[in-house]
């Protein structure tokens, strides 16, 4: 395990910030201030120090600062100094060099590198108000949420998902064209694409199964915490095979066979009706003896928080990757005093760096002396003195 913490964070023309710099000293940070002050923007900046679109999931063109009358956002940058174990701090950064650009540049110690290299130094995991509707949204949202948990522990999962999606698009283009024109699709090409889909699909299913089992074990060991226990499940056929211990070759073979037999059906439907892209995450509240979707909003929030904390705990024991950095946006406001105190104790015990936001300073009373307090407002970022 390599400890990792952000020592500093610098923003330039990012969202509401023309310029901002936060020195953390490697400590956890709680950010408080009025709605719209820019607290979540700071968490989003940290989340972009990882591959992907960050915690808001928007296009890169949207995050550049834009003044009235400007058609597109400006070029923007996020940079950080990251301390990993006993090594010297490392400078990482990302941004776009031209306003409205769709691709970002990533730099490590001033050298341009692929975005995947960010995961070698920091792994943000987050919980935001957008995830409050996780149990009400379509299966794709829960699948995307769970895949982020998988990716944090197995970075190759993202590349496998991209490979699967690309092969899926190519296969569907052939099948839809054949369905519309009546001309047969190239069978050899379809077989080759389905072989790729089966390979990537089996890898995805097994990675999801490994992650689910690890998270369930972590959650089961957390019975003494004042957060609800959850039983996790994956509903997809291929994930079920992986959970039951089916070897990779068996999943790959059966998926390839299923795809081949579904060509006509998929072409007529205009979408693939079998594969790991159809799976779903199921969460069951053990004490309430009911699915999470039937629980109160408060219990749903607590279930997801416990899942994120379990994820942080399991990743903190990884041997070959940096510790996660936890981003909790407006989470404390939805917890009662007992759970708020438990959250502070949990974050302290995990010895991981966390960034939390809330409108009221009193929400973080249990973190005072254990984390750095920062007021976010019109005057910028104001660091509080420790009491």
Curated annotation (Swiss-Prot):
InterPro entries: AAA+_ATPase, DNA-binding_RecF, DNA-binding_RecF_CS, P-loop_NTPase, RecF/RecN/SMC_N, RecF_2
SMART domains per the UniProt record, alphabetical: AAA (SM00382)
Molecular functions (GO terms): ATP binding; ATP hydrolysis activity; single-stranded DNA binding
GO cellular component: cytoplasm
Phenotype on disruption: Increased susceptibility to UV light.
Compartments reported by the entry: Cytoplasm
Described function: The RecF protein is involved in DNA metabolism; it is required for DNA replication and normal SOS inducibility. RecF binds preferentially to single-stranded, linear DNA. It also seems to bind ATP.
Cross-referenced HAMAP family: RecF (MF_00365)
The name this protein goes by in its record: DNA replication and repair protein RecF
